[in-house]
């Protein structure tokens, strides 16, 4: 199907990526219905913010329990709509349930007013909800990303209006059902297309967006026009520095897992593998051994280790990047061809000697294609890591920890992992710099994004 159908159509549509067949459709909303939903949410939010924090988090904890109890029901739907491996869909849901429990435990303490000594008899800050948070979320983690923004916002007393990707309506509808069963009346789904996004932004008090940098610029522009607090989690082209004293077996295994998990469709995946001369050949050999073990196939089957891409246009875009790289001097060590047959499959592709002449050097590669960059030395490796418009995450593999930490401080990224692939941890803030966005999700920092930190001062 044409990309425009997914992006601009008022119809929400599930298409099985493993076959290319349409399996479900639902109509979108009118702007009038959107305005009615916003008005209804505002009424509920006024009551929700007045509830004791212990009651709010009890319902969030109940949501986590419901997700845990419904993994077997939800995971196949995510696999059907997104195309991800069934065990990866289950892992997404299990992590989301832990998110609910984490904030249910944390929020009551973090949202207590804080006393700050000044010349006043009493002064400090309180944490109050902003109101309604409107979120535009992508398709690749339809439950995790929806709740990564919503759970802390709800705990703080906000209401949440979610615009899901138009290709995951069934996953989203099931999430809404669990929200209602948990007794959370201040979460709703806006079944709208992009033409109605500005109306939603204007009607709400803050905006959260996860997706491409290009769309993020549009969201930021609309939010700025209406002076709305915004958190943007955008694209990434995460570098991984493999230094001369790295544990190559571990680095190769984890780089392959990070790059090809979820068919490479993660903003936080390892995408640019930067090697120094001393270990380049040995690392490549170990990495290719991991890549050749990947088995494409039906994502529902336990033996499959490489899933299809989500849409045909995403596969076309990735293949164009790979073809361009080969045309500009990169060596294709594996993959690089669109396979025959149904579905949106693309083979695990490794491009060696990717240079600045290649589009994939500068652009985010959202699929199973790894770029190998050759650095002259460690300083050059850091230069290559920073030679990108993105700044989401990065990793450094070295057994010399002080040196690895020193290099990590020079990398322009929202997070740097040493001797581990980039990932997100509930207890740590997640977000980027540069064209990867601003604001943070997860941890206490994610909780404070959508509150009014109100100063109080008493004579």
Q: Which functions belong to the PLM regions below?
A:
Residues 22-29, 44-50, 135, 240-243, ...:
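Short, well-ordered beta-strand elements within core beta-sheets of diverse protein domains
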Residues 159-161, 332, 415:
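A short hydrophobic/small-residue beta-strand
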Residues 19-25, 241, 295, 327, ...:
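Conserved C-terminal structural/oligomerization subdomain of aldehyde/semialdehyde dehydrogenase
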Residues 1-121:
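N-terminal Rossmann-like NAD(P)+-binding subdomain of aldehyde/semialdehyde dehydrogenases
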Residues 183, 214-355, 418:
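ALDH superfamily catalytic-core signature
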Residues 20, 56, 78, 100, ...:
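Residue-level signal for inorganic ion chemistry
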Residues 45, 49, 64-67, 71, ...:
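Structural signal for hydrophobic packing residues in well-ordered secondary-structure cores
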């Amino acid at each position: 199907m044409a990309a425009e159908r997914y992006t601009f159509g008022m119809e929400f549509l599930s298409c099985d990526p493993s076959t290319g067949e349409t399996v479900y459709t639902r109509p979108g909303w009118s702007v009038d219905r959107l305005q009615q939903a916003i008005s209804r949410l505002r009424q509920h939010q006024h009551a929700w913010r007045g509830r004791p924090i212990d009651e709010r988090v009890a319902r969030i904890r109940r949501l986590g329990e419901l997700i845990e109890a419904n993994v077997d029901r939800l995971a196949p739907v995510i696999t059907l709509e997104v195309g991800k491996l069934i065990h990866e869909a289950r892992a997404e849901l299990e992590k989301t349930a832990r998110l609910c429990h984490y904030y249910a435990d944390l929020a009551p303490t973090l949202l207590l007013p804080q006393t700050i000594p000044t010349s006043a008899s009493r002064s400090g800050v309180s944490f109050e909800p902003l109101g309604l948070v409107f979120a535009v979320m992508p398709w690749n983690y339809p439950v995790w990303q929806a709740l990564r923004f919503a759970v802390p916002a709800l705990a703080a007393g906000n209401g949440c209006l979610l615009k899901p990707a138009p290709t995951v309506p069934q996953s989203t509808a099931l999430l809404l059902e669990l929200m209602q069963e948990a007794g959370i009346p201040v979460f709703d789904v806006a079944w709208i297309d992009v033409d109605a996004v500005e109306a939603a932004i204007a009607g709400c008090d803050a905006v959260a967006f996860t997706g491409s940098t290009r769309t993020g610029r549009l969201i930021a522009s609309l939010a700025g026009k209406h002076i709305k607090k915004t958190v943007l989690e955008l694209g990434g082209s995460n570098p991984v520095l493999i230094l001369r004293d790295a544990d190559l077996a571990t680095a190769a295994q984890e780089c392959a897992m990070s790059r090809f998990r979820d068919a490479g469709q993660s903003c936080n995946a390892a995408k640019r593998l930067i090697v120094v001369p001393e270990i380049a050949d040995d690392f490549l050999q170990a990495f290719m051994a991991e890549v050749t073990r990947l088995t494409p196939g039906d994502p529902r089957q336990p033996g499959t280790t490489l899933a299809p891409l989500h849409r045909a246009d995403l596969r076309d875009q990735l293949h164009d990047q790979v073809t361009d790289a080969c045309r500009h001097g990169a060596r294709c060590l594996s993959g690089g061809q669109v396979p025959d047959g149904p579905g949106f499959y693309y083979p695990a592709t490794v491009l060696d000697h990717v240079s600045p002449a290649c589009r994939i050097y500068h652009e985010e590669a959202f699929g199973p294609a790894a770029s190998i960059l050759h650095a002259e030395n460690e300083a050059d490796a850091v230069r290559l890591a920073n030679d990108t418009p993105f700044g989401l995450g990065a990793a450094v593999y070295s057994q010399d920890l002080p040196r690895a930490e020193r290099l990590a401080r020079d990398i322009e990224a929202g997070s740097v992992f040493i001797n581990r692939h980039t990932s997100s941890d509930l207890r740590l803030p997640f977000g980027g710099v540069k064209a990867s966005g601003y604001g943070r999700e997860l941890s206490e920092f994610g909780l404070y994004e959508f509150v009014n930190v109100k100063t109080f001062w008493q004579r």
